[in-house]
């Protein structure tokens, strides 16, 4: 029996024959096919163990947070889909709604601390705007197409938003005691903002809707606990508005994670997150301390002088990540460090 016939018999193809072709022809074709399969199998088996050997568990997902309206109350979820533009939970996406003033500029808790008391939730086909001592407002998930498209600015960059209507505008303006506020929604057909326009270290493909710069912010419980050990009054993770909070790792371990794997999701670290007055707003009361924890962070979390061109003189706390591979992550998922 020839080598080709032996291989076919071994794989159960002894009766295989291409009608109308000489024996030598179909044996050659079959042998080439088997060789390709064998080479592919060997390559896959060699690559897969190497990748697995590079994995090192560095923590566990402890909390997941989505902030549907920029600067407003966060929504704690047990699982979320990781997309290129941030976390998604059902119809709610991270920072896909925005409060603007009459000039179209973003309004955040830096200027209006009480924004952190406003929540946006979703049930079935209805959104609910709510805040303490204020009657809830029900809104459709998608604003009517007849509502105007408004030109908005987030950190000086132009972006569109679909106006959510007069009722929403009046509700937000009344709660904040501001005139002429509007609530807008980012729609899929709209052009996102380029993260690279904010910081050159981002890739061309990194994009966001109304987030400051990055689709994902990662913070560890250990880092938060270290900060709290230096403060007279403890602060929460939500003071820093992270998307993914990690437990079971060392203090500031997230600063050195270049790429992590959570389930099927791969995230790549881009840069540290600089901190501003927003961190001084109590997420439970909407009152700004105007000092802490920012002053304490400045005492020990400034960047290396060689990185001042990137971070300036603002303290850094937490890390910005961008998406490498999409998927779903859940509270309790192990976090693996991919090979450096």
Swiss-Prot record:
Entry's transmembrane regions: 25-44
GO BP, one annotated term: nitrate metabolic process
Record InterPro entries: MoCF_Sase_C, MOCOS_middle, Pyrv_Knase-like_insert_dom_sf
GO terms under cellular component: mitochondrial inner membrane; mitochondrial outer membrane; mitochondrion; nitric-oxide synthase complex
Enzyme Commission number: 1.7.-.-
Cofactor remark from the record: Binds 1 Mo-molybdopterin (Mo-MPT) cofactor per subunit.
Keyword annotations from UniProtKB, A to Z: Lipoprotein, Membrane, Metal-binding, Mitochondrion, Mitochondrion outer membrane, Molybdenum, Myristate, Oxidoreductase, Signal-anchor, Transmembrane, Transmembrane helix
The UniProt record lists the keyword rRNA-binding: no
Reactions the enzyme catalyzes: N(omega)-hydroxy-L-arginine + 2 Fe(II)-[cytochrome b5] + 2 H(+) = L-arginine + 2 Fe(III)-[cytochrome b5] + H2O
Annotated region described as MOSC N-terminal region, given as residue ranges: 96-186
Domain MOSC: 191-338
Mitochondrial matrix side: 2-24
Primary localisation category: mitochondrion
Recorded topology in the membrane: Single-pass type II membrane protein; Lipid-anchor
GO molecular function terms listed in the Swiss-Prot or TrEMBL record: molybdenum ion binding; molybdopterin cofactor binding; nitrate reductase activity; nitrite reductase (NO-forming) activity; pyridoxal phosphate binding
Cytoplasmic topological intervals: 45-340
Compartments where found: Mitochondrion outer membrane; Membrane
Required cofactor(s): Mo-molybdopterin
Sites of N-myristoyl glycine lipidation: 2
Chain sites annotated for binding Mo-molybdopterin: 70-71, 95, 214, 241, 243, 274-276, 320
Disulfide bond annotation, renumbered to this chain: none
The protein's role, per its UniProt record: Catalyzes the reduction of N-oxygenated molecules, acting as a counterpart of cytochrome P450 and flavin-containing monooxygenases in metabolic cycles. As a component of prodrug-converting system, reduces a multitude of N-hydroxylated prodrugs particularly amidoximes, leading to increased drug bioavailability. May be involved in mitochondrial N(omega)-hydroxy-L-arginine (NOHA) reduction, regulating endogenous nitric oxide levels and biosynthesis.
Subunit details: Component of a complex composed of cytochrome b5, NADH-cytochrome b5 reductase and MTARC1.
Domain characteristics, as noted in the entry: Comprises two structural domains, the molybdenum cofactor/Moco sulfurase C-terminal (MOSC) domain and the MOSC N-terminal region, forming a cleft that accommodates Moco. The MOSC domain, which contains a large seven-stranded mostly antiparallel beta-barrel, engages multiple interactions with Moco both pterin ring and phosphate group, allowing for a tight coordination of Moco within the core of the enzyme.
Protein name as annotated: Mitochondrial amidoxime-reducing component 1
Native species: Mus musculus (Mouse)
Gene (name only): Mtarc1
């Amino acid at each position: 029996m020839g080598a080709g016939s032996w291989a076919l018999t071994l794989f159960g193809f002894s009766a295989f024959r291409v009608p109308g072709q000489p024996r030598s022809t179909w044996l050659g074709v079959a042998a080439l096919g088997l060789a390709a399969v064998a080479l592919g199998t060997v390559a896959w088996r060699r690559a897969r163990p190497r990748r697995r050997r590079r994995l090192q568990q560095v923590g566990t997902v402890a909390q997941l947070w989505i902030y549907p309206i920029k600067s407003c109350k966060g929504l704690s979820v047990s699982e979320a889909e990781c997309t290129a533009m941030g976390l998604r939970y059902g119809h709610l996406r991270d920072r896909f709604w925005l409060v603007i003033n009459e000039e179209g500029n973003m309004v955040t808790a830096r200027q209006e601390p009480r924004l952190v008391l406003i929540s946006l939730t979703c049930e079935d086909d209805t959104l609910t705007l709510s805040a303490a001592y204020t009657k809830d407002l029900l809104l459709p998930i998608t604003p009517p197409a007849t509502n105007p498209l408004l030109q908005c600015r987030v950190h000086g960059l132009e972006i569109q938003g679909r106006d959510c209507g007069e009722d929403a505008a009046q509700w937000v303006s009344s709660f904040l005691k501001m005139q002429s506020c509007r609530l807008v929604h980012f729609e899929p057909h709209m052009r996102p903002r380029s993260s690279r326009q904010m910081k050159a270290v981002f890739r061309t493909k990194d994009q966001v809707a109304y987030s400051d710069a990055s689709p994902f912010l990662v913070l560890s419980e250990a880092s938060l606990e270290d900060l709290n050990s230096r403060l007279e009054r403890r602060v929460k993770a939500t003071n820093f508005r992270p998307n993914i909070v990690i437990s079971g790792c060392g203090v500031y371990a997230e600063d050195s994670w270049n790429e992590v794997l959570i389930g099927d999701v791969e995230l790549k670290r881009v840069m540290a997150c600089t901190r501003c007055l927003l961190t001084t707003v109590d997420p439970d009361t909407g009152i700004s301390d105007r000092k802490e924890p920012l002053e304490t962070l400045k005492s020990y979390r400034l960047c290396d002088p060689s990185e001042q061109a990137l971070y300036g003189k603002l303290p850094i706390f937490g890390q910005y990540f961008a998406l490498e591979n999409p998927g779903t992550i859940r509270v309790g998922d192990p976090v693996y460090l991919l090979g450096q």
